[in-house]
């Protein structure tokens, strides 16, 4: 595990962070995904060569709205999904297509190169070709080519490991240089310092491990702010298989005195149930638009930190 080796950084503060889940359902049948991967050669296979089942893909994406200390709002997208048809539906359902057209979304932050977070890029760029895109600097040539062939005409920012990257007051990104299944390298996540509350982190899949991520935030952001909340995939039990070795993750989260846990996507419903049993403050949802349970923040749901 290679994480940023950094000195404490002042990332500033913001008033609040609102996250609207556009889609956390990256696929609709987990067994089919596993079968696709197995047929292609296993978890070390290049994702770009897997013959994915055409009707099983969805995507992961969220709209993030940050209120600055002066009351102004900044909007950006966290990830851009997978299946273009599914993402088109999600964007139109939530009005993201209009926000992109009107220039009200500032940038796209792609957590990592996995297909369900990145391959829906053509839909996003259809509405805003000049949108600024932030990625890690560990993308393979296929990922770079996808950006080009998707019609991107804006600025591409590549963030590397070794330091926290201040994006705007109250918000910073941290990149972990780690190998990930399906031949992906590197993932980064976001930290927000919310005035009067503490640190909030937003993740894609959190392949770096949620405790590693939260440790980095607590130790490397000036002022020793406490952890307040988190949103996103935590990759604890993505295919609903629980093992005893995962128990310390739940205990570790419980020890942090978090105030809001809005985990979804690859966290796993079984992990959500373990969190609830451990009295973690899990934010629940409405189980609509394809999300499978009301026990977590799902498609079309919002959470405010």
Residue ranges of predicted features:
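Short polar catalytic/cofactor-binding loops
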Residues: 15-17, 21-29
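Conserved beta-strand hairpin/beta-sheet module of binuclear metal-dependent hydrolase folds
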Residues: 25-29, 34-94, 187-203
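Divalent metal-coordination and catalytic microenvironments
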Residues: 64, 79, 91, 112, ...
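Short active-site oxyanion
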Residues: 73-76, 106-107, 130-132, 199-200, ...
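Active-site metal-binding motif and surrounding structural segment of the metallo-beta-lactamase
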Residues: 85-134, 221-231
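A short acidic, amphipathic alpha-helical/loop segment
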Residues: 90, 120-124, 146, 213-216, ...
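Cap/insert and terminal regions of metallo-dependent hydrolase folds
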Residues: 113-115, 191, 196-201, 205-296
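Metallo-beta-lactamase
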Residues: 135-188, 284-304
